[in-house]
């Protein structure tokens, strides 16, 4: 965990993600990425020179078979406030509207519910669990499927909602996330959603895996190019415009 904490701290500092006095909500989906983000920030908050507070926040969409009680217990052990918001999104998407392509609507409704909850609690900063591999895959998806160079940014300010998104796990590789989740015995919540899975991202994962046999430093080269090029928002120390 010390290695991951070091990577998270460097990412936070490189992109000036956290200021003194911040309250940072971690969007907890129950997956390994968001739970590790929560764990890392909770530990970082104990010694980081800019004092900040961490809260966990989950939008419970009503998917049958999903329980976040284990996450609640974990938050108590971490000493982190846990905000749970129940919204009948599953019912709307699958039972009322019977969407053929439900993921887009579900994501839109969850973002809206999250924004409302943050506003109600006076929180203006949220940490998301995207990691190193997510960034590389998103970059390639943008290039291959959209014909452009693009990716989410380490720090994104959403002017419409006055919310800042940060991604402190960006220097952490997926294999490190997997290993840490096992070692820490994180209370991962299995997602039984009938639409769970992202075909295009899986295609890109398989493409990268097939190329890494010949080019083992492929992901490192792509990630480095994103910072050196740099993509908008990716230049370390603000060197991105």
Regions found by a protein language model. Name each.
Residues 1-137, 145, 175-183:
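ATP-dependent adenylation/nucleotidyltransferase module used to activate substrates
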Residues 2, 35, 65, 108, ...:
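Electropositive phosphate-/nucleotide-binding environments in soluble metabolic enzymes
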Residues 6, 10, 14, 73, ...:
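Charged/polar, solvent-exposed surface patches and flexible loops
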Residues 54, 133-210:
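Catalytic subdomain that performs nucleotidyl-dependent activation
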Residues 61-63, 89-91, 156-159, 172, ...:
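Residue-level detector of flexible, active-site-proximal loop/helix-junction positions
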Residues 102-107, 128-130, 171-175, 214-217, ...:
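A general structural signal for short secondary-structure boundary/capping elements
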Residues 107-119, 155-161, 208-227:
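Short, basic, helix/turn surface patches
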Residues 186-241:
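The feature marks non-catalytic terminal segments
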